[in-house]
Amino acid sequence: DRIEASVWAFGRGKESWLVEHRVLMGDTARDAVWKSLAEMLAETWTHASGAAMPLARFALDTGFATQEAYAFVRACRDSRVMAVKGVPRGAALIGTPTAIDVSQGGKKLRRGIKVYTVAVSIAKLEFYNNLRKSADVGEDGLTTVFPAGFVHLPKIDAEFIQQLCAEQLITRRDRNGFPVREWQKMRERNEALDCYVYARAAASAAGLDRFEERHWRELERQLGLAGPPALETPTESINEATQRGGLAVSGNRNTGRRVIKSRWLS
């Protein structure tokens, strides 16, 4: 009866900020709620500097309302939109994409939609480890210093926090007596956690795990921020997905139901 979407921002050292969480009410078998979701692709969010930032990537979970989700991805025709499906285990956060669309002859279409598997255990373990981190005070006694991976959360209600922390990693024995680690739900509702997992996968697809200092400097340049002195090594152009995460001209913003808005946005 709804679609839930979280907007997360990521920075140096994989520091993260929950920007916004929306609950779009509506029957997923009907078009209205999907149209509301599509409107987010045209929106921008205001950086603290005043620059407008669009979504760099948009990951859509296809595990529920699968055919409707596929239809949404096809209709968007937007390279930022990626269909994803969570799997318990994997060697990498994002797996090799699988082609879904086929021709009448049964051959997979090269230009059809592809579904990326997401090893949810990797993202959840990283997230829960980062939630344990705390900020420190700089040497001047005034500046707040955040460690790599620190998770910034705005004012959120207890229900949202419980959803973020809805699972725990346990060890059980399989039928052969070998130990197996798996995630176990402690409560039924875990949409907030799922939204983070797929946002983290989207950030990885946009290049987060491969970013070097030069990439962050280029993003800062696009935002009009005065960064540290330039490196001696030349800055190379970054890929299209990263550029979409930089400064863009904003159109009229389509507003939706707001549940959370970060204090880091103006």
Regions found by a protein language model. Name each.
Residues 2-58, 262-266:
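Nucleic-acid-processing active sites and adjacent nucleic-acid-binding tracks
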Residues 220-224, 232, 236-266:
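Extended acidic low-complexity intrinsically disordered regions
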Residues 1, 8-11, 62-63, 84-87:
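Short loop/turn segments at strand-loop or loop-helix junctions that form parts
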Residues 63-235, 239-240:
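C-terminal nuclease/phosphodiesterase catalytic domains that cleave nucleic-acid phosphodiester bonds
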